[in-house]
Amino acid sequence: IGFVRRRDFRRNYMQLQFTPRPTTPLIRKLRNELSFDYITTLDGRLESRQLRYLLAPEFQNGDEWWLEYNRDFEFLSKPFEIATDVVLPIGPYASESIYSAYNLGPQRPVNGWVGFIRGSFFGGTRTQVKYFGRIELSPILSVEPRISIDWINLPQGHFISKLVSGSFNYTISPRSFFSALAQYNTSTDSFSTNIRFRWEYEPGSDLFVVYTEGRQTDDRGFPVLQN
């Protein structure tokens, strides 16, 4: 859906992990993670809290399956426009969600993961489907398609948010590479691009050349330059 920068806060975070190796011939290891994130303002008022449990078996072929439970709390200190004409009012919001994903191992020429989220969301519900892929066309060339679709149902309104992006990575030499990213976001009606060149001209010293552009797509015709 998007991100908002958080200011003037204090954070406490705890994570426990236990990863046994079962004797079964199917599973290589079984990762268990429990984390707790607690964020307050500087004067001690609770802003955000997240309890998360992850169960992730890694199979003998290198693939992984993730099953995650999240229990969240968020306090909005001012109204927030989450989508066009959909404004969340001030107040506390509690939510629960289940996330499941299957991850193809990096040893495959075509790898990546596909995931699904379902749960409560700011007094309503959210269903999300996402895909992140990586295709190795050659040892020096790869492409990474990504897509995320959210179906949001809130008391203030209903909307669908789509985020589609793709990147292109080319390794020129062991010391230099070129990459390009293009992204389209329906929530903000924006299209952005990022082009980057990196050259390590001597060990420990790098030169980066980066070009970034953002355009609005809510007007008719060619997208208008935003930044």
Enumerate the language-model features and the residues they cover.
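Exposed, low-structure sequence patches enriched in small/polar residues
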Residues: I1-N227
